[in-house]
From Swiss-Prot:
A GO cellular component entry from the record: preribosome, large subunit precursor
GO molecular function, one term: ribonucleoprotein complex binding
Record-given protein name: Ribosome biogenesis protein ERB1
Keyword rRNA processing: yes
Origin organism lineage: Eukaryota, Fungi, Dikarya, Ascomycota, Pezizomycotina
InterPro entries per record: BOP1/Erb1, BOP1_N_dom, WD40/YVTN_repeat-like_dom_sf, WD40_repeat_CS, WD40_repeat_dom_sf, WD40_rpt
Length: 843
């Protein structure tokens, strides 16, 4: 009803001089049209048993002589008790008749011509003087006929009250039967509110039915719209200033201070609406019974499964054709053979001659021609930028000063031919005034400007990358964990493989030094050196003629001969250590000036029984031990901040039990010393502090070179073990706590040749393999990384570095991962010590 009423209001504004009675009649006719479409949706209706000639046609209103009573067009219909409607439909507004309107039927005639809602579009001019029932809606197949007021029957004896029946009892029918003016039965149904989902809701007769038409269109009228019966809704009277003040003082419940735009009256809120607003204001849930904390159902787990859920073999039905599908295909084939299914249906050709349209092929007589050999395609326009947007970013918009400067410039001097402009929406963008000129200039450029073909360099990006060999070609290198060594309590700080490659020595936080069989992981020997201090470093003496193990525990260095060798080798090892005691006795009685600042002592009887034969008390904690290649010297470094610079680096002579401090002053720049190593073939000592590495010639007692890796804090370094006079010792690898692995070519520069950043945490140790072109590093992220690093004697070629493998197995404990590693002297094996208290052999 809203749409029909709204349409009439626009019609009323265009025809202000049309009488109001005609407007109301127009509304009633539109109501019949909309009611007919609603009747189509009903499954059963009271008119189902009537003949086609006795179905209702139309009703009309007689407004002659000031009468505004509706008359019903009816026809005598026999009562059919079998026709009962189970649906509810509102025809009360269409069937309401006044009983006293029959007397005025002959005074005036109202003729309605046209079909408002029929589908056939034909006028039934031949049928006249047919009486229509006043309570039914015409069917879809019957158009409205011309109805004259002379044939309109009188109305009802009594008017309807317009109230809905009480349908609380399910057994009662949803209609009531009354007698019309001709004595026939009329089925009266309760009205249905079209704005409500329920069919039993009451109709608000005072509701405004103007729809979406603004109320401003009614400013010049005394009314603000029409109700469902077509009557005007008068504009409510507005209170004065005093009434508004009293209303603001005495605020009723549900008062909002707003005006309802559809009625013009104050807008009142119901209790449910107030409760809804309160919940929204308090940030509560508006829906009753809604639980925001329902338990979540995890459809997927957070654990990534590596193995399949089911390893069952594939069933046989996966590999054989389906019999069911074969039957369906044969059905289709049979239908195609019988002609019931056409595999291809040719499209129907349109006969253009019948429609009077002549068509022809524009390119029928032309064949494609190849482009000219010197043809150059037209250059494409550059893509638009942000400044050409209708809503560009603020930084692209010019200010007043920039706009004035742009306007004062000549067109040739302007950087661009337009100014960026901001519009809120795309529909507000006007036409571009320079559109035609820009297209004209583009056409001039296309056919007047000469084109030049420029050759571009087609370079494959992969060709710029260095060609590295495949890791499969660089085998052997360690890939898997072969042996696990368990026994230490706490972290394993250091380990070392003896020169024969049979035994593995390790030291940890529990103050013990343990010797293992490398291949089996069986513990062969152990000694408890301290109950409080940890074993920081363990290193084997190079050479196979004697077996001597040096260990740093606390502020002392212990020299031991493990009870794992035969008697001859054990006697030779004891002779190497005991040779120094005789030298110390002879020098004590002589007048020589060479005296050791540190006195070597014999251990306690308990340690001597365990295999410890000498103790060197340094006074400070040594974190690094490195042997000379001949096995008679080893250097120790005490990197503590409290250690004096003069005693931080010490060189010890095993055959003389002599300790010397070569550096009397702290190294310039770079902080305290960290690690020291002897050159594998030359009398050069490399000393690394926090930021630099210095090379000293021990024979000449001079500084040879200073390397600057660029790291913040050097943790370890190693020298390439090749004995070639051209390449031996010329390359170093440096590990730092800032996660960088650096390769130094000493002859090339004092800066690193390569910097590798593959670890996520600090690098603890780096090590070259004695014979294979391999090196590795360990990190606190719990991984070892194996690299291939080949060095040649050709000065024109650089080192070739290839990443090979990442080994993971140690657990990160206390933010510490893998603390130390060592290589097997002959095989491509390595061992690692972790903070998780284990050692691992990688093969």
């Amino acid at each position: 009803m809203t749409a029909s009423s709204g349409g009439y209001q626009g019609w009323e504004r265009r025809n202000n001089n049309i009488p109001e009675t005609v407007g109301i009649l127009f509304l009633q006719v539109r109501a019949v049209s909309s009611g007919k479409k609603a009747a189509q949706c009903r499954e059963t209706a009271p008119t189902a048993g009537l003949s086609e000639s006795s179905r209702p046609r139309l009703f009309a209103m007689d407004y002659s002589k000031g009468s505004k009573k509706r008359k019903a067009i009816t026809k005598d219909v026999d009562e059919d008790p079998s026709v009962v409607s189970g649906d509810e439909y509102d025809l009360e507004a269409l069937d309401r008749n006044d009983s006293d309107s029959s007397a005025d039927a002959s005074d005036s005639e109202i003729e309605l011509i046209g079909d408002f809602s029929s589908d056939d579009g034909e006028d039934d001019d031949g049928e006249d003087d047919d009486e229509l029932d006043s309570d039914e809606v015409p069917s879809d197949t019957e158009p409205f006929a011309r109805v004259k007021s002379g044939n309109i029957a009188t109305g009802l004896d009594g008017s309807l009250d317009g109230e809905s029946n009480d349908l609380s009892d399910d057994n009662e029918p949803n209609y009531r039967i009354e007698k019309d003016a001709n004595g026939n039965d009329r089925y009266i149904y309760p009205e249905i509110n079209p704005d409500d989902n329920s069919e039993y809701s009451e109709v608000d007769e005072e509701a405004n039915t103007i729809g979406d038409i603004p109320l401003s269109f009614y400013d010049q009228y005394p009314h603000i719209g029409y109700n469902i019966n077509g009557k005007k809704i008068l504009r409510p009277a507005k209170g004065q200033a005093l009434d508004a003040l009293l209303d603001s003082i005495e605020i009723p419940k549900g008062w909002t201070g707003l005006t309802d735009p559809s009625t013009g009256k104050p807008l009142q809120l119901s209790q449910e609406e107030l409760e809804l607003l309160r919940k929204v204001q308090m940030n509560e849930i508006t829906q009753d019974g809604y639980d925001p904390y329902q338990p979540t159902i995890e459809y997927f787990t957070s654990k990534q499964e590596i193995m399949p859920l089911s390893a069952a073999p594939e069933p046989k039905r996966r590999f054989i054709p389906s019999k069911h599908e074969a039957k369906r295909v044969m059905k289709i084939v049979k239908a195609i053979r019988e002609g019931r299914i056409l595999p291809y249906k040719p499209p129907e050709e349109e006969d253009a001659t019948q429609e009077g349209i002549q068509t022809y092929d524009l390119w029928a007589d032309e064949s494609p021609r190849p482009d000219h050999p010197m043809n150059i395609p037209a250059p494409k326009l550059p893509p638009p930028g942000y400044e050409e947007s209708y809503h560009p970013p603020p930084e692209y918009l010019p200010d007043k000063k920039e706009k004035e400067e742009w306007e004062n410039q000549d067109e040739e001097d302007r950087e661009r031919e337009y100014l960026p402009t901001d519009y809120s929406t795309l529909r507000k963008v006007p036409g571009y005034e320079r559109f035609v000129k820009e297209k004209f200039e583009r056409c001039l450029d296309l056919y007047l400007a000469p084109r030049v073909r420029r050759s571009k360099l087609n370079i494959d990006p992969e060709s710029l990358l260095p060609k590295l060999p495949s890791p499969e070609e660089l085998k052997p290198f360690p890939t898997t964990c072969a042996t696990l060594f368990r026994g230490h309590r706490g972290r394993v700080r250091s380990l070392a493989i003896d020169p024969t490659g049979v035994w593995l020595a390790s030291g940890g936080d529990d103050g013990t030094v343990r010797v293992w069989e490398l291949l089996t992981g069986r513990q062969l020997w152990s000694v408890k050196l301290s109950d409080e201090d940890a074993v920081n470093v363990v290193r084997w003496r190079p050479g196979k003629e004697a077996v001597v193990l040096a260990a740093s525990v606390g502020d002392s260095i212990y020299l031991a001969v493990p009870d794992v060798v035969n008697l001859e080798l054990e006697a030779a090892s004891l002779e190497v250590i005991d040779a120094g005691w005789g030298y110390a006795t002879s020098t004590g009685t002589s007048t020589t000036k060479k005296t050791s600042p540190v006195q070597w002592t014999r251990p306690a009887s308990s340690l001597a029984d365990s295999g410890v034969y000498a103790v060197i008390p340094l006074g400070y904690i040594a974190k690094s031990i490195s042997w000379h290649r001949r096995g008679d010297y080893f250097v120790t470094v005490c990197p503590g901040t409290s250690t004096p610079a003069s005693v931080a680096i010490a060189i010890h002579t095993l055959s003389k039990h002599l300790t010397q401090y070569p550096f009397r002053r702290r190294l310039k720049g770079g902080g305290s010393p960290q690690v020291a190593h002897f050159h594998p073939s030359k009398p050069i000592l490399f000393v690394a502090n926090q930021r630099s590495i210095r090379a000293y010639d021990l024979s000449r007692q001079t500084l040879v070179k200073i390397l600057r890796p660029g790291a913040r804090w050097i943790s370890s370094f190693d020298i390439h073990p090749t004995s070639s006079s051209t390449s031996g010792g010329d390359n170093l690898i440096v590990g730092s706590y800032d996660r960088r692995l650096l390769w130094h070519d000493v002859d090339l520069s004092d800066r690193p040749y390569k910097t590798l950043r593959y670890h996520q945490k600090a690098i603890r140790a780096v090590k070259y393999h004695p014979h294979y072109p391999l090196f590795a590093d360990t990190s606190d992220d719990g991984s070892l990384q194996i690299f291939h690093g080949s060095v040649t004697g050709d000065l024109l070629s650089n080192a070739n570095i290839v990443p090979l493998k990442v080994l993971k197995g140690h657990k990160v404990t206390g933010d510490l991962g893998v603390l130390d590693l060592d290589w097997h002297p002959r095989e491509a094996w390595c061992v690692s010590a972790g903070a998780d208290g284990t050692c691992r052999l990688w093969m």
